[in-house]
């Protein structure tokens, strides 16, 4: 049996881009029109559960026999706060409810990163310029080589250990991501004085988080302060590693595409949708996996519809997959383990100044095809 040839960005016609855009817009419009009580009930339940896990965790960590359960409970609380609640609320998924506490303009999460900073680096830069090399800073976070088209430098030999460090301290790396520290330390296009000034509001939030977890709650524990300090440290570590792993598995498996800057010149709605499809990947799992990942297990659907409540992605996914099959586009998904393995293989490969993969030729083809596509559109 002959294998079906999948389309790439450059092989689609303007009419196909337009059709894909219309079909995905129809899904989005239908979902927006259907938002209502079940969505409000869902997010209220998530907030309630997150608070219950936090209270239970902080109490149990002060009781030696239940300390380990307390660490686990607080870890779940922090993951829910960041993934299923904070990330999604800050995308404006629940702004329509008119509740100040769940409005993207007001929400502040349990993270060293300020919500204001996150909405710049993530909501705007990453979601607008998804996987566009030179515009999406999430491609390596200024730290790693995550694209075949990034010029290799000796520092990238440390890709693997630096990725471990990034996972370990993820909340602090994203907190300072907007500083683009590599521009001062490596490329000398920013000064230390600029970095220091821009760091002030970030440090204010980081201090609050550090004081809460490592001073306030340990102090409340009295003689058990070391146990609470350690428990908070482990809960933050669990949240950091899990959040980073989820994000990496949605963006860096080997079959996920990256694009030259020319792709976004005169980009149509349909072309934007296709770029999101080709630049994202899902991983499979049950309901608990979806909740704990903030439904970023449906990273493709999230990039297509970032302002649709994430718990809806499971029902949207079959329609998106059908559209991909209809137009010959790959729908990239796999188990969490498979996506993790693929991601780390890519990280390892790109640490070396080795030959480039076949993806480069496709990206070059994209670049060459863009001008006539844009004119025809």
Language-model segments: residues:
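Low-complexity, highly charged intrinsically disordered N-terminal segments
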Residues: 1-56
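Short, intrinsically disordered terminal tails adjacent to the first/last structured region
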Residues: 1-8, 362-377
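Non-transmembrane, extramembrane segments of multi-pass ion/lipid transporters
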Residues: 27-37, 182-192, 258
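Alpha-helical bilayer-embedded segments of polytopic membrane proteins, i.e.
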Residues: 41-82, 156-172, 197-245
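Membrane-embedded catalytic scaffold of the fatty acid hydroxylase/desaturase
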Residues: 76-197, 264-354
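Feature representing long, continuous alpha-helical segments
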Residues: 213-217, 227-247, 271, 275, ...
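Extended hydrophobic/aromatic segments used for targeting, binding, or gating
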Residues: 218-219, 227-268, 353, 362-372
């Amino acid at each position: 049996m002959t294998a079906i040839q999948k389309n790439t960005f450059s092989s689609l016609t303007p009419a196909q881009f337009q059709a894909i855009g219309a079909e995905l817009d129809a899904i989005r419009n239908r979902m927006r029109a259907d938002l209502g009580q079940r969505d409000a009930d869902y997010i209220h339940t998530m907030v309630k559960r997150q608070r219950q896990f936090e209270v239970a965790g902080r109490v149990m960590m002060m009781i030696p026999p239940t300390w380990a359960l307390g660490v686990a409970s607080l870890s779940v609380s922090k993951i829910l706060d960041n993934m299923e609640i904070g990330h999604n609320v800050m995308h404006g998924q629940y702004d329509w409810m008119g509740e100040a506490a769940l409005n993207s303009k007001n929400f502040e999460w349990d993270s060293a990163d300020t919500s204001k900073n996150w909405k710049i680096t993530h909501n705007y830069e990453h979601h607008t310029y998804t996987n566009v090399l030179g515009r999406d800073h999430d491609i390596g976070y200024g730290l790693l080589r995550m694209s075949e088209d990034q010029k290799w430098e000796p520092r990238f030999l440390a890709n693997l250990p630096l990725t471990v460090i990034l996972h370990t301290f993820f909340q602090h790396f994203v907190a300072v991501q907007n500083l683009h520290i590599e521009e001062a330390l490596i490329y000398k296009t920013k000064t230390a004085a600029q970095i220091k000034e821009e760091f002030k509001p970030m440090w204010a939030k980081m201090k609050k988080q550090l004081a809460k977890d490592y001073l306030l709650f340990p102090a409340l524990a009295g003689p058990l302060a070391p146990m609470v300090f350690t428990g908070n440290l482990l809960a933050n570590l669990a949240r950091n590693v899990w959040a980073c792993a989820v994000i990496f598995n949605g963006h860096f498996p080997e079959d996920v595409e990256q694009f030259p800057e020319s792709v976004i010149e005169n980009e149509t709605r349909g072309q934007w949708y296709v770029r999101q499809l080709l630049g994202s990947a899902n991983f499979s799992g049950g309901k608990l996996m979806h909740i704990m990942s903030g439904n970023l297990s449906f990273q493709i659907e999230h990039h297509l519809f970032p302002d649709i409540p994430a718990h809806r992605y499971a029902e949207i996914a079959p329609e998106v997959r059908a559209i991909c099959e209809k137009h010959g586009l790959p729908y990239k998904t796999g188990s969490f383990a498979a996506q993790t393995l693929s991601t780390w293989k890519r990280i390892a490969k790109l640490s070396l100044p080795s030959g480039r993969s076949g993806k480069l030729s496709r990206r070059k083809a994209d670049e060459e095809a863009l001008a006539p596509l844009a004119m025809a559109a």
